[in-house]
From Swiss-Prot:
The gene is cyn1. This is Cyanate hydratase. The lineage of its organism: Eukaryota, Fungi, Dikarya, Ascomycota, Pezizomycotina. NCBIfam families: cynS. It catalyses: cyanate + hydrogencarbonate + 3 H(+) = NH4(+) + 2 CO2. Its EC number is 4.2.1.104. Belongs to the cyanase family. Catalyzes the reaction of cyanate with bicarbonate to produce ammonia and carbon dioxide. Keywords: Lyase. It comes from Talaromyces marneffei (strain ATCC 18224 / CBS 334.59 / QM 7333) (Penicillium marneffei). The active site is at R103, E106, S129.
Amino acid sequence: MSHLNIATLDASQHPYLPASSQTLFAAKAKKKLSFEEISQEIGRNEVATAAIFYGQAKASPEDITNLSKALDIPYELLEEQLSGFPDRGRSVEMPPREPLIYRLFEIVQNYGYAYKAVLNEKFGDGIMSAISFSTKVEKETDADGNNWAVITLRGKWLPFSRY
């Protein structure tokens, strides 16, 4: 399906991304596929799929096979580029300058301690895992026709150990 709103990559704006990012985004743009469509082809959540494209999530052998088929990329090339371990957290400068990413950063700046306090009251002393974790993005439209972004973060609660 052809879309007007397809996320693409300007590699000059992202010098820390792995080579696989350029390979994947070029094929995605050529086929005019959304992350939602690709995620359906490979059997992953659309945010997890996008994280593979940005080098922030590890692709399984099954992911590599399915991405190769969905995007018409030679399997051997993807296997070479995606078989290592991600170098997570290096792709975004801090503080972020990209407006949408900055808004997410700003949410944590403004509400981080409030989240922490409420989570500690509900669960005790600990942290929410970003490893045993899932996330999703949904679109809601209210009665007035306004669009709302709904981002769900689901992380396993990890209590701090006493030692």
